[in-house]
Amino acid sequence: MTSSNFPKAERLLRRPEFLQFNEGASKLHTQHFLVLLKLKEGTGTRVGFTVSKKVGNAVVRNSIKRRLREFYRQNKSLFILADINIVAKKGADVLDFQQISTELAAAFGRLRKKYA
């Protein structure tokens, strides 16, 4: 059984970690999200979430980030060994958790096929 927590070792936390996606990251666009992927060697997947002010106010942005974190916690097996940044696009604020899960599960299914 996989752990259902989200420890610091699995998070992208600092600005330089997010800036690495500007150089040579693979991109996958969905209707409401952009998934940036940087393959790495070593152990563990690290995930970060970016929601800009274009999406909504602080309450809305934090709500989206909570739902994205919960998606990661529940679906760790979908994620490949890489640094991943999930960027919410404008319009992501109207999605409920089920819609987010469906859209991102399909996206990560495509990524697993491409990089497996």
Curated annotation (Swiss-Prot):
<dbReference type="GO" id="GO:0030677">
    <property type="term" value="C:ribonuclease P complex"/>
</dbReference>
<keyword id="KW-0255">Endonuclease</keyword>
<dbReference type="InterPro" id="IPR020568">
    <property type="entry name" value="Ribosomal_Su5_D2-typ_SF"/>
</dbReference>
<comment type="subunit">
    <text>Consists of a catalytic RNA component (M1 or rnpB) and a protein subunit.</text>
</comment>
<dbReference type="GO" id="GO:0042781">
    <property type="term" value="F:3'-tRNA processing endoribonuclease activity"/>
</dbReference>
<dbReference type="Pfam" id="PF00825">
    <property type="entry name" value="Ribonuclease_P"/>
</dbReference>
<keyword id="KW-0694">RNA-binding</keyword>
<dbReference type="GO" id="GO:0000049">
    <property type="term" value="F:tRNA binding"/>
</dbReference>
<dbReference type="GO" id="GO:0004526">
    <property type="term" value="F:ribonuclease P activity"/>
</dbReference>
<dbReference type="InterPro" id="IPR000100">
    <property type="entry name" value="RNase_P"/>
</dbReference>
<comment type="function">
    <text>RNaseP catalyzes the removal of the 5'-leader sequence from pre-tRNA to produce the mature 5'-terminus. It can also cleave other RNA substrates such as 4.5S RNA. The protein component plays an auxiliary but essential role in vivo by binding to the 5'-leader sequence and broadening the substrate specificity of the ribozyme.</text>
</comment>
<keyword id="KW-0540">Nuclease</keyword>
<dbReference type="GO" id="GO:0001682">
    <property type="term" value="P:tRNA 5'-leader removal"/>
</dbReference>
<protein>
    <recommendedName>
        <fullName>Ribonuclease P protein component</fullName>
        <ecNumber>3.1.26.5</ecNumber>
    </recommendedName>
</protein>
<keyword id="KW-0819">tRNA processing</keyword>
<dbReference type="InterPro" id="IPR014721">
    <property type="entry name" value="Ribsml_uS5_D2-typ_fold_subgr"/>
</dbReference>
<comment type="similarity">
    <text>Belongs to the RnpA family.</text>
</comment>
<keyword id="KW-0378">Hydrolase</keyword>
